[in-house]
Structure formats: structure tokens, C-alpha cells
Amino acid sequence: MALLVEKTTSGREYKVKDLSQADFGRLEIELAEVEMPGLMACRAEFGPSQPFKGARISGSLHMTIQTAVLIETLTALGAEVRWCSCNIFSTQDHAAAAIARDSAAVFAWKGETLQEYWWCTERCLEWGAGGGPDLIVDDGGDATLLIHEGVKAEEEYEKNGKIPDPASTDNAEFQIVLGLIRDSLSVDPKKYRRMKERLVGVSEETTTGVKRLYQMQYSGTLLFPAINVNDSVTKSKFDNLYGCRHSLPDGLMRATDVMIAGKVAVVCGYGDVGLGCAAALKTAGARVIVTEIDPICALQALMEGLPVLRLEDVVSEADIFVTTTGNKDIIMVDHMRKMKNNAIVCNIGHFDNEIDMLGLESFPGVKRITIKPQTDRRVFPDTNSGILVLAEGRLMNLGCATGHPSFVMSSSFTNQVIAQLELWKERASGKYEKKVYVLPKHLDEKVAALHLGKLGAKLTKLTPSQADYISVPVEGPYKPAHYRY
């Protein structure tokens, strides 16, 4: 794979699709800044003191216009930054170009192969002879995974000379990861351990990545502290819900131009993401059906007037299928073969294994007809009918559209900045062990408060006697940690 790092005139490393798109990217970044009051408030509050001076931050998170504002907030606070995308289709090339030219090292472009994707992830983590990053901003956990797998392989190699064998797994993507680590062993057999020793911690953006972190914590294999940004209320109850409510129909319409009204739509999963997707489809006039494993979530859907059925009950009746579960094997090839002609199948969970894309690709005689980028018709030979698969089973709102809008991402990314500041500030105190943490309630409330003025809100103030009556401080936090918003 002949990929070469390029350098700007100032000497900054990068690999993007087209650096000449930087001016266009800069114009959209300036528009987004107006819609991201939380991040701009962070610049105003912390910029003068440069709290990240001397810090190296590596980010693996969708390289969009909104992420560009996050990156430039980190650099405005003094950090050096290297960045890659966490999805092969989610990069906005003009955003990547603007950041590469003006602010940070970027390795990302829309339409990467899996080999290119992991090459970009490796470049993002490499800071030269001094080791790796001090901090990681992760989305889905791939940067964290690469370091953990690299350390594991180096230790086995030092102990018994064992070299990772890509043929030891059937997972095509993990074969690439093992090959990457195998090649690094021959050049620098201590690279990932140096990264581990330098790392202060990671802040994780999304549900899937958080699951990975907790799995490592419970198994005792987590190598550094982690802050779970996803479960901040101002992330999961806003980005996951309202962001998806906005970006799901945007992706559907850009990809297919289909009229949603009157269609039967199946939403697999009714967590925060599923709730937002179902609300969007219902508002657009679709007849929405939910599938669920959790009786509480199922009851919530029923209270919203949404039938809860099994996929097998409705697979031949529905027009649109959306997976939102964060689990695997939700829609299988046998389901797809029973669907209506031109039924739309898409995923808004982080990885591509909610839909059985491997089984679809390998099904005998199936024909792939590309309508346009990230919109493919798959025709089955025995029925001569087909389905429309969006973004190859990956995140359709970023593959087929531009993802969540700036305002809701400001809330999520303000949490990221606060988490990174907290990890860096406490790096020598021992406050954070090799465990997963969440941000305290008063910081969650602060993130929300930073976004109220933009929408013209005016908060009512508690009197001291009112605060005493309900046993909360006048300035908050107003809810206990266990409160369910």
C-alpha cells in the first residue's frame, strides 16, 4: 500500500484528499463556530491560560466541519493535535483540508479502504521518537484498541518470540490490524509500550466505544484511565437523540430521494438513538414499528403509540429498516431476501456488523449495482428483486449526509474538551486509576447552561429557602447522579 505522508509549507504532516478545498472548509468552519457556543465559551474561558500547553492530543473521531471546531478549540487551548476519522465514509474532505492547512496534522479522506483507515489511525498515534500522544479523543475505541493490541503483541513477542498472525482470525478488518502490528514489531518492538507509558488517558465519545472500555475494565486489561463522555446527559440525551432525529431523514433523502410519508419503517432498538430515529420517521409521516429486547424500552415505545414486534413479523411488509442497537447480527441475509423490492436497509450504529454485510457480499450470485456513492442496490438471483443498502452498512447519516448539526455537536464536544482538561489537570495527582469514569453532574449542567443563551432561554433562579426545601445548592447541581432525564 503506497501511502506517503505529505507536508504543508509550514512542515505540518497530513494526508487528505485535496488540500485546495481548504478555503471552502474554512468558510463552513466559520459558520459552524456561530452554532457551537459551548466550544467558543471554552476558548474564551481557558484560552488565555493555555492549559494544554505541552500536551499532545491524538483524535480518532469523524473528521467533519463540527470536529474541525473541536480541533481548533484544543489547539486554541495550547495543544498539539494529530487527527484521523473513525469511519471510512464520514470525513468531509473540505474540513480535513482546512484543518491540515491551518491547525493540525490530519490523516483522513472520504472513501478510505480499511487498509487506508488503519494506516491513518497509526499515523495519528505516531509522534516521533518521543513516543505517542498524552491524550486520546476516541470515537468507537479504535485508537484505544490499536494501542492495547499493540502492547499485547509486543509483550508476547518479547516473552516467546511470537509474531501476530493475520491468518489466525476470520475477521478481515482485524487481519489488517494484526498485519499493521506485525510490521511495526520488525521496525520498533517497543513502540506501543512507549505510547502506553506516556498516555495520561482517553475520553470516549460513543456507546460502542464505551462498551469496549467497560469490557477491558472488567477483565482487568485497561491500560490507562478513561472518561466516558457518551453517558454525560448533555451528550447521550442530546446528540444521540436530537442529533439522530435530524440526521437520519437527511441521510435517507440524500441517498434515495424517497418519500418517507406513508411508508412502513422498522427501527431496530429503542434506546436514545432509536428514540430519535423513530421520532423523525413518525414526524415525516411513516408508520413506525420498533423491535426491542428490553421490556422497559419496549414499553416506552408502546406509550408513544409505536407497535413493538419481532423483525420476522414485519420483514416482508416494511419499506425502510434502520438498525440502532450497537449490537451485531440484527438484520441477516435471510431477512434481506424476504424484503420488498427496493426496501431500504441502513444502520446508524457505529460499526457495520448490525447488518450482515459479510453474508450479503458472499451470498452466491448476488449482484451489486452502485446507484451513487454509498447507495447500492443488491439484487438476489433467485428472486430477481433487490434492496437498497446505504453506506455499506456503516453510519448512514455520515456516509450519505453530513451527520449531526453543529449546535447539538457543540454539546457533545464541550464535554470532550472538559474531559480532556480534567485528565490533563490531574495527570500527576493519581486521581484517575485505570478505570472508566463519568464527568460529575455540575459539569454536565455547565455544558447545558453554555447553550441556553443561543436559544434565548432564561433560567429561573432558586431562592435560598427553595433550595433548602428541596436540599440542593442554589447554584446546583440540581439532580442526584441517579436521576433519569
From Swiss-Prot:
Cofactor note as given: Binds 1 NAD(+) per subunit.
Residues binding substrate: T64, D139, E205, K235, D239
Top-level taxon of the source organism: Eukaryota
Residues that coordinate or bind NAD(+): 206-208, 240, 269-274, 292, 327, 348-350, 397
Known pathway: Amino-acid biosynthesis; L-homocysteine biosynthesis; L-homocysteine from S-adenosyl-L-homocysteine: step 1/1
Keyword NAD set for record: yes
Gene3D superfamilies: Adenosylhomocysteinase-like, NAD(P)-binding Rossmann-like Domain
Molecular functions (GO terms): adenosylhomocysteinase activity
Reactions that this protein is recorded to catalyse: S-adenosyl-L-homocysteine + H2O = L-homocysteine + adenosine
Keywords: Hydrolase, NAD, One-carbon metabolism
Pfam families named in the record: AdoHcyase, AdoHcyase_NAD
Record-linked SMART domains: AdoHcyase (SM00996), AdoHcyase_NAD (SM00997)
NCBIfam families: ahcY, PRK05476.2-3
Protein name: Adenosylhomocysteinase
Organism listed in the record: Phalaenopsis sp. (Moth orchid)
Gene name per UniProt: SAHH
